[in-house]
Amino acid sequence: MMEKGSNLVRERAARAWERHLSWVPTLYLLRGIPYVAILALVPIVLNRMGVSNAVNLFCCSLALIPFILRPLLGRFSRQLTDCHHLILYAEVLMGLIFLAMGIVLRLKVWLPAFLFLFYAEALAAAFHDVGIGRYFMICSERRFYQQVPATRAAATCAAFALALGIPAMVGGNLEVIHRRIPMAWSTVCELLGGVILLLAVYHAVVLVPLGEQLVRKRNDYKALLFEDLRKLTDRRYFRFEMLFLLLFLLPEGFFYRVGILFLVDPGSNGGLSLSPQELAFTQGTVGAFGMLLGCLLGGRCIHLHGFRYWLWPMTLAITLPKVFYVLMAYTLTTSFSLITLSVFLEQFGFGFGIMAFVAYLAHLSRGYHPVMFYSYCFALAAIGITVSGALSGILADYLGYRIYFALLMLLSLASYLAAAFVRTEPIEGLKL
């Protein structure tokens, strides 16, 4: 009976993979929207609503905690429902929460309820992420995160345009039309919720139910956690792998959201005073395009020459372009062309450099139980980004943008330290 069920799952997975181009782009597009909301959109909304940068970035960083708990959520979700329904339930929930966030923004006392819904959105997004990982792994016959990388990268980068570029443009225009900031960003949240619900309906039609078996027995999650950690720590280069995961993106955690707020903050606060419409063009359109080009080029380079060959160039690419923000902070340039070019170069370098992290994460996820190892490795990386993001707003408020970005260049040494100690012998010639 169990063998018959396994054969049925394989048949349905093969049928789903035959038309994967009908669901992979939209699924990864929707997967990227919550990340963009956490990293960029909600910080902008809170900034426009008058919340200080320190409180803003601290609260937004807490939304990454569900992604740190991803391994436990993955274990727990296997007892709730199959990955097909998990994806659909999470998408409907995310859409409804965005609609509720839009309603809450119209209230006089809005911040506590808004943050509660925001954290609920992050939790639903983490479950959605788990469901996508399981569904993709089954359909691609366990070649976990090795298929259609260009399609997934393009869809994820398109999420920046859909969840940052377009909403920021709409929000800025509505601010001008209505002269009411809460009304403008309330409408943005409601429109984004509607888009998510439409994509959920589309996925309900195109995604093939796999009929996977649920885990019916009650698990001892504490015992399972220790067992998973034992398997993780038994790896030959465990310490060096964890060092890389924690440190490589640490400077980016300190930079990204502060960089966005620097662009929109008024000159009296040391910012560049871009309007939401200008931010939508620079960060949400030109920046997203630069990141997409960087990701595609980085993936191609690693495919041709391997991880070790491109590790140091990619480390330089993800750190050195931050110097443009140092220059802009000290000059307070008003040239929109120079600002846009600087954002493009920084995002291109980020897209190119992060492919080293993606490649290493893909390598660590190979072998026995790839979803489990991917979840734990992703959680470790999320810890570094969460801690750095929580501190970034406090430090930026205290030091000012000029000193903060200058110190950030020194903090980039963490990425070089991670690259120096990574053990590349076992993954030489790694292909994406």
Question: Over which residues does each language-model region extend?
Answer:
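Cytoplasmic membrane-interface "Motif A"-like loop-to-helix N-cap segments
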Residues: 79-93, 303-317, 336
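Helix-loop boundary and gating motifs at the non-cytosolic
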Residues: 6-67, 240-244, 248-268
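A late C-terminal transmembrane helix in Major Facilitator Superfamily
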Residues: 367-398
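C-terminal ends and interior cores of transmembrane alpha-helices
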Residues: 92-109, 316-334
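C-terminal membrane-cytosol helix-exit motif in multi-pass small-molecule transporters
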Residues: 194-213, 418-422
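Juxtamembrane intracellular "pre-TM" segments in multi-pass secondary transporters
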Residues: 2-18, 211-241
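Helix-to-loop junctions at the C-terminal end of transmembrane segments
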Residues: 68-82, 293-310, 396-397
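Glycine-rich segments within core transmembrane alpha-helices of 12-TM secondary carriers
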Residues: 147-172, 378-389
